[in-house]
Amino acid sequence: MAKQIQAIRGMNDILPTQSPLWQKVEAVLRSSVSAYGYSEIRTPIVENTDLFKRSIGEVTDIVEKEMYTFADNNGDSLTLRPEGTASTVRAGNENGLLYNQEQRLWYMGPMFRHERPQKGRYRQFNQFGVEVYGIGTADIDAEVLMLSARLWEKLGISDHVSLELNTLGDPAERAVYRDALIAFLEQHKDALDEDSKRRMYSNPLRVLDSKDQNVQAILAGAPELMDFLGEESKTHFSQLRELLDAVGIKYTINPRLVRGLDYYNRTVFEWVTSSLGSQGTVLAGGRYDGLVAQLGGKDTPAVGFAMGLERIVLLLETLELNKDIPSEVDVYVTAMGDSCLVEAIKIAQELRSALPNLKVMSHCGGGNVKKQMKRADKSGASVALLIGEDELAEGMVTVKHLRNDIEQQRVARSALGAFLAELAIK
């Protein structure tokens, strides 16, 4: 026997038993962004490597360690996209969507990062994101946070997530703070871990996000960015908080929240959960007003967020909120003998036409009644339709209930659609 080929480490299959939960999550995401009037954008999986170096930042973990980069046959450096925002900006600039325009966009698709696979974190993962361009005021920051809160409500996990909020100010304010932070870190350099020492000069704000407990103890005395903000940044953040208070969205201000990508300014936020252990962040985002110009467009304010679907699915499974997923099959149609096969197939087609939301599976492959009923039960269907010679002669169909103790019934073929609709099989 030939050796089986396995999936690449950290790149997982989503199997038929898992797909219904994924479909539920995706349906909630689509309906939620639709309710806010957002439009879908789809971008290529492969982009020029420079796109991510210029947007994410050359001294970030993603660019330094995690990107899947390769040279094509022309010698061009290409990269599997590690996140969705840079591609969305590139597409907007290239296709004239952003200049002097407002755009509310969303995307969903696979991303790739070569990091150590662990629960809820994979090398290929599915990301959903929202991006808004052309609006620089705090009300749109509030809107994307309201939208994110709506997702949790519709998924039934509002009580299991909490919002952390911060502001990074504008680039000039952050530059002054950066110098102050470096000066502070230099006083404690010998006590820092190696990762923080490496970042101290190249990307000092990322030291604030260190997971090392000793570093966090040192940072308790560090200067806070909030003290370096100008009036405009303070007003923006104050207006955002007022709007969130007005609509009842609770939050905690986290002065250590800086996000892992270089392009953020002013508002940054994360929705976190305590139900997934160390992988606590389930959605993150913020404002990135300089990114469009950084990638060749005009100065354009922008704000958005992204979430990994694997973590949302894992959270739903952890909280055991995946139990009410409907079966992929509502009705299983059987033929009691070869002479009944054609009519059984026709009945299945009639039901699909009359009741478009009904999920109808036809038995194929023959077999006796016992075999067909075993397949019907395994399919997860609520009822099986038995079509034999007696039923055909009388214009009837036998309905066998598979999930409760109701006795099987004979129903006129002409009334079958109405009967199944009355059973509330949807």
From Swiss-Prot:
Superkingdom of the source species: Bacteria
Keywords attached to this entry: Aminoacyl-tRNA synthetase, ATP-binding, Cytoplasm, Ligase, Nucleotide-binding, Protein biosynthesis
GO terms under cellular component: cytoplasm
Catalytic class of the enzyme: ligase
Localization annotation: Cytoplasm
GO MF annotations, alphabetized: ATP binding; histidine-tRNA ligase activity
Reactions catalysed according to its record: tRNA(His) + L-histidine + ATP = L-histidyl-tRNA(His) + AMP + diphosphate + H(+)
Signal peptide range: none
EC number: 6.1.1.21
GO biological process, one term: histidyl-tRNA aminoacylation
Main location: cytoplasm
Subunit description: Homodimer.
UniProt family annotation: Belongs to the class-II aminoacyl-tRNA synthetase family.
Designated name of the protein: Histidine--tRNA ligase
Lineage: Bacteria, Pseudomonadati, Pseudomonadota, Gammaproteobacteria, Alteromonadales
